[in-house]
């Protein structure tokens, strides 16, 4: 049976993650408050961010930047700014 959470990103009830995907307190907060749909949206943004800024996950400063962007995106409603990216328009 699917686990539902009130997703703070979508601001509605939605299917929750199956297990904690991120370590520590932030991981618990994500597990308790973020839906599968919101996490999938973050993963797309994260991939674009890593590629555009050429982030190296072996570099602790790059990991901290990515974690801050994740927190801003999922919990504070701030979109990830990717220079030169123009989102497709809805039809």
UniProtKB/Swiss-Prot annotation:
Please explain the role this protein plays, according to its UniProt record. Could be a mediator in iron transactions between iron acquisition and iron-requiring processes, such as synthesis and/or repair of Fe-S clusters in biosynthetic enzymes.
Q: Keywords in alphabetical order, please.
A: Iron
Q: GO biological process: what's one of them?
A: cellular response to oxidative stress
Iron as a keyword of this entry, yes or no, is yes
GO terms assigned for molecular function: iron ion binding
Alphabetical list of Pfam families matching this protein? Iron_traffic
**Disulfide bridge positions per record:** none
- Stated family: Belongs to the Fe(2+)-trafficking protein family.
Is Iron one of the keywords UniProt gives this record? yes
Instruction: List the GO terms this entry assigns under cellular component, sorted alphabetically.
Output: cytosol
What is this protein's name? Probable Fe(2+)-trafficking protein
Lineage top rank: taxon: Bacteria
């Amino acid at each position: 049976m699917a686990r539902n959470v009130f997703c703070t990103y979508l601001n509605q009830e939605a299917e929750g993650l199956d297990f904690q995907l991120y370590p520590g307190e932030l991981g618990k907060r994500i597990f308790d408050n973020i839906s599968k749909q919101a996490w999938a949206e973050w993963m797309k943004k994260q991939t674009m961010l890593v590629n555009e800024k050429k982030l190296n996950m072996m570099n602790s400063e790059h990991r901290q930047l990515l974690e801050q962007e994740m927190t801003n995106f999922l919990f504070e409603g701030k979109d990830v700014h990717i220079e030169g990216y123009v989102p497709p328009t809805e039809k």
